[in-house]
Curated annotation (Swiss-Prot):
One of its GO terms (molecular function) is tRNA (guanine(46)-N7)-methyltransferase activity. Pathway: tRNA modification; N(7)-methylguanine-tRNA biosynthesis. The keyword Heme does not apply. Substrate binds at K133, D165. It comes from Chlamydia caviae (strain ATCC VR-813 / DSM 19441 / 03DC25 / GPIC). S-adenosyl-L-methionine binds at E54, E79, E106, D129. Disulfide bonds: none annotated. InterPro entries: SAM-dependent_MTases_sf (IPR029063), tRNA_(Gua-N-7)_MeTrfase_Trmb (IPR003358), tRNA_methyltr_TrmB_bact (IPR055361). The keyword tRNA processing applies. This is tRNA (guanine-N(7)-)-methyltransferase. It is an enzyme of class 2 (transferase). GO terms for cellular component: tRNA methyltransferase complex. It catalyses: guanosine(46) in tRNA + S-adenosyl-L-methionine = N(7)-methylguanosine(46) in tRNA + S-adenosyl-L-homocysteine. Keywords: Methyltransferase, S-adenosyl-L-methionine, Transferase, tRNA processing.
Length: 224
C-alpha cells in the first residue's frame, strides 16, 4: 500500500467523526463528538489486549516498531497531520501490523471525547511541538486539562513517558506531571537514555543536529 491510497472519507463541508480502514478520523473545527457512537476498543482491535498510545506519531516509525515487537499489546498512534497519517497507515499495511490503530486528529480532543476512564496502560508523547514563544503557550500539549485527562484514562500503575529535545519544555512538563503522577526517575526526574525506548525518526533527526534528547517517565499514583 502506498500512502496516497488512503483517502479522507468525507468532504470538509460534510466532515464528521468516522472510522475507516482502521483509522479514526476526528476533524478539526468539529464539535459534534457526542453524536458519534464509538465502538469499544475490544471491537476496534478484535481482542481485549492491553492498550498503549503514542501521541505525536509523525511518520510512524516508532509506533510501528513497538507494535511489531510487542504483539501482545494493542497500540494507538495519534497524529493530527493527514500526510503523516498516510505514512503510518502505509507502514501498518505493508508490514501487516494487526495490533495498531490510527487516530487522525488532535490528541486533546481524542482524549477528552473518545477515551473512557482507565483504558490505557501506557502513553508515550514523542517530541511534541514545544511552542517556545510565550504568546503560543496555549497551543502546547501539556496543559492542566490534558493532564487531567491523562490521569483519567491511565489504568492503575499506568505509565506516561515524554521524549523531547527542548529542555525548557521538559522542565515545565515535569512540573505539571508531578502534581498528579509519581516520577519513576530520581530528581531531576529525567534522563538522557531510557531503556527499551526504541528508535524514532525525530530522535534520529535531532541527534543528527547535535541536540540532546531528554526522557521523563511518571506512573499513576494509587487512588487517582
Amino acid at each position: 500500500m502506498k500512502p496516497q491510497n488512503l483517502k479522507v472519507p468525507f468532504f470538509w463541508e460534510e466532515r464528521s467523526t468516522e472510522i475507516k480502514d482502521n483509522v479514526l478520523y476526528i476533524p478539526n473545527h468539529y464539535f459534534k463528538h457526542d453524536q458519534f457512537i464509538m465502538p469499544s476498543w475490544e471491537e476496534f482491535f478484535g481482542n481485549n489486549n492491553p492498550i498503549s498510545c503514542e501521541l505525536c506519531s509523525g511518520n510512524g516509525d516508532w509506533v510501528v516498531s513497538q507494535a511489531q515487537n510487542m504483539p501482545q499489546m494493542n497500540w494507538i498512534a495519534v497524529e493530527k497531520r493527514f500526510d503523516r497519517v498516510r505514512k503510518i497507515w502505509s507502514k501498518m499495511h505493508n508490514f501487516q501490523v494487526s495490533n495498531l490503530r490510527i487516530v487522525c486528529g488532535e490528541a486533546q480532543t481524542f482524549f477528552r471525547h473518545y477515551l473512557k476512564n482507565e483504558i490505557l496502560q501506557r502513553i508515550v508523547v514523542n517530541f511534541p511541538d514545544p511552542w517556545p514563544k510565550s504568546r503560543h503557550r496555549k497551543h502546547r500539549l501539556f496543559q492542566d486539562e490534558f493532564m487531567n485527562d491523562v490521569v483519567r484514562v491511565l489504568v492503575e500503575s499506568g505509565i506516561l513517558v515524554l521524549a523531547t529535545d527542548d529542555k525548557n519544555y521538559l522542565v515545565e512538563a515535569i512540573k505539571m506531571m508531578r502534581q498528579c503522577l509519581l516520577p519513576t526517575i530520581e530528581d531531576p526526574y529525567y534522563c538522557k537514555v531510557l531503556d527499551n525506548y526504541g528508535d524514532s525518526w525525530f530522535e534520529r533527526l535531532w541527534r543528527s543536529k547535535g541536540q540532546e534528547i531528554f526522557y521523563t517517565e511518571f506512573v499513576k499514583k494509587v487512588g487517582i
